[in-house]
C-alpha cells in the first residue's frame, strides 16, 4: 500500500505564515478575520489541525496544532471563533454558506465567481435540479427576500425540520441562498436571503468551468505552497479529477511544478519556499 506523502518542514512553515498559524498573527476581530479570508481566498470556519487548509478557528488559535475541544462553550478560542463567525455573517463583506459536500466555508468576494461556476446553477435549471422542498423555500424567499427560519418553514409549507434543513442546504450548496444573521434570543434562528442580493456582481459574472478549476487551484496553492494527493479535494469539496485538472492547468502555464503523481508545488518565481531543482525533497527528480 502506497504511503501518503508528507508535507516538508519548509512548506509547513510557509503555511504557518500564510494561514496565520503563528501566535504573532492571530485573528482577534471581525476585521482581522475578513482580511484573513481575503488573503487566503477561502477558508473553513471551525475545522482544526486534523483537517487540511486555512481555517478561521486555527487562525484564532494562532498555532499549527490547534484541536477543537469537546466542550466548545467553555473554551475561549472556540467561543471567539464562533462569535467572529456570527459577526462576519452580519457584516456581509465575505460570502458564508454550506457549500459543496456540506463544507461550511468563507469565500473572499474575488473567489465567488469561480466557486459559483462549479456549484451554482442557472435559474432555468432549478426545476430540474432542485427538490420540491428547496423550490418551495426559494419561491418564498424570492417573494419576501429575507426571512427567519421559523417563518420560512411556515410560509413554504416545509414544516418538517429535517426536510427544511435539507432544502436550505440544497439552496446553499447551489449558491442561491445565504444566511445574513443568527439570533440566539428569544430562540435560536437564522435569517435567510438570496445570495445575489449581497453579492450581485460576483454571482452574475460568468466564467468557464475550466477557468474556475484553475483559479481555485491557484488560490489554494498560493497559500499551501504545495499540495499532496487528495488534499485540495478535501479542502474545497471538488471531486479529485477536477482538482487534478485545476492543478495541471497551473503546471501548463508555469505557475506550478508537478513533482510526483498528485503532488504539485509553486514554482520559485511564484513564491515557492523551495525550488524543486534546488532541494533535496523526496519529490525532486
Identify the function of each model-found stretch.
Residues 1-285:
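Long, low-complexity intrinsically disordered regions
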Amino acid at each position: 500500500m502506497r504511503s501518503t506523502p508528507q508535507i516538508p518542514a519548509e512548506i509547513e512553515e510557509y503555511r504557518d505564515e500564510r494561514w496565520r498559524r503563528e501566535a504573532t498573527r492571530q485573528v482577534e476581530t471581525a476585521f482581522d478575520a475578513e482580511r484573513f479570508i481575503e488573503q487566503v481566498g477561502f477558508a473553513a470556519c471551525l475545522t482544526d489541525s486534523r483537517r487540511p487548509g486555512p481555517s478561521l478557528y486555527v487562525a484564532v488559535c494562532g498555532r499549527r496544532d490547534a484541536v477543537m475541544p469537546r466542550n466548545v462553550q467553555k473554551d475561549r478560542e472556540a467561543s471567539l471563533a464562533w462569535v467572529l463567525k456570527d459577526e462576519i455573517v452580519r457584516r456581509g463583506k465575505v460570502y458564508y454558506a454550506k457549500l459543496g459536500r456540506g463544507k461550511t466555508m468563507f469565500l473572499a468576494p474575488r473567489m465567488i465567481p469561480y466557486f459559483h461556476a462549479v456549484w451554482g446553477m442557472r435559474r432555468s435549471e432549478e426545476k430540474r435540479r432542485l427538490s420540491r422542498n428547496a423550490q418551495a423555500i426559494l419561491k418564498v424567499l424570492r417573494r419576501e427576500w429575507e426571512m427567519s427560519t421559523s417563518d420560512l418553514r411556515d410560509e413554504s409549507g416545509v414544516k418538517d425540520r429535517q426536510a427544511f434543513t435539507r432544502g436550505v442546504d440544497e439552496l446553499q450548496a447551489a449558491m442561491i441562498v445565504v444566511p445574513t444573521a443568527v439570533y440566539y434570543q428569544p430562540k435560536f434562528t437564522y435569517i435567510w436571503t438570496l445570495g445575489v442580493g449581497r453579492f450581485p456582481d460576483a454571482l452574475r459574472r460568468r466564467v468557464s468551468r475550466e477557468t474556475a478549476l484553475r483559479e481555485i487551484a491557484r488560490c489554494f496553492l498560493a497559500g499551501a505552497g504545495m499540495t499532496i494527493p487528495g488534499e485540495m479535494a478535501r479542502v474545497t469539496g471538488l471531486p479529485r479529477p477536477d482538482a487534478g485538472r485545476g492543478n495541471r492547468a497551473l503546471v501548463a502555464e508555469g505557475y506550478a511544478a508537478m513533482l510526483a503523481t498528485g503532488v504539485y508545488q509553486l514554482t520559485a518565481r511564484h513564491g515557492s519556499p523551495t525550488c524543486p531543482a534546488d532541494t533535496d525533497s523526496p519529490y525532486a527528480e
